[in-house]
């Protein structure tokens, strides 16, 4: 019954979603009880797609339940229609989306990895040694990005763009330089 009444609404929302300029996506494990032909402990996946206030579409969150984490799910969901920016984590499936979709990374996901590294390093490093690590320096730079975003939160999209170009872009370039330099040093 729910499928009969809600599926048409979901499809209309998805059409609107696919017309947006900016979208976000993520996937998470879901344990489903009494799924046909599966054990109760089987992990399935909820793929989540959302628009935000800058997307050019109404704000919405769409959920797509799948039995696997296979990379074709976001490709199928976005279909031949979506064309714009898609913010997501580093999961490889998103990076195999068609070229008409510009994949952008999520700073919160990147930050989480550096924070996890710091948690491990804190066991064996002094505070002074920690400050020299790439993880610490990356966290400090990410903190600066967050401060910039907080300062420009209430500005128009055009004003935010200008401020990001002026303030965040040089920081981002330095951030990537730090990571590339660190990566090259780790290879030697």
Predicted segments with their positions:
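A generic secondary-structure signal for well-formed alpha-helical elements
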Residues: 2-13, 17-20, 114, 118-121, ...
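RNase H-like nuclease fold core
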Residues: 3-88, 92
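Conserved protein kinase catalytic core
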Residues: 32, 95, 115
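Single, function-defining residue in the core of a domain
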Residues: 93-95, 146
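Conserved beta-strand -> loop -> alpha-helix junction used to position metal-binding or nucleic-acid-contacting
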Residues: 99-126
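A conserved active-site cap/scaffold subdomain adjacent to cofactor or substrate pockets
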Residues: 118, 130-149
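Core structural elements
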Residues: 166-176
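Single conserved hydrophobic/aromatic residue that forms the stacking wall/gate
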Residues: 180-188
């Amino acid at each position: 019954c729910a499928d009969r009444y809600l599926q048409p609404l979901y499809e209309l929302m998805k059409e609107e979603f696919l017309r947006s300029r900016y979208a976000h996506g993520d996937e998470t494990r879901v344990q489903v009880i009494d799924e046909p032909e599966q054990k109760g402990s089987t992990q399935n996946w909820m793929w989540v797609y959302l628009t935000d206030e800058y997307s050019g579409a109404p704000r919405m969150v769409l959920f797509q339940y799948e039995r696997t984490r296979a990379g074709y799910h976001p490709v199928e969901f976005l279909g031949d229609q979506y064309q714009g920016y898609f913010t997501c984590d580093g999961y490889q499936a998103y990076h195999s989306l068609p070229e008409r979709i510009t994949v952008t990374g999520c700073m919160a996901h990147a930050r989480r990895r550096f924070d996890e590294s710091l948690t491990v390093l804190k066991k064996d490093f002094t505070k002074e040694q920690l400050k020299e690590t790439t993880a610490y320096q990356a966290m400090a730079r990410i903190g600066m990005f967050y401060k910039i975003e907080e300062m420009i939160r209430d500005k128009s999209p055009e004003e935010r763009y200008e401020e990001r170009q002026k303030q965040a872009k040089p920081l981002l370039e330095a951030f990537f330089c730090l990571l590339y330099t660190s990566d090259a040093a780790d290879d030697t």
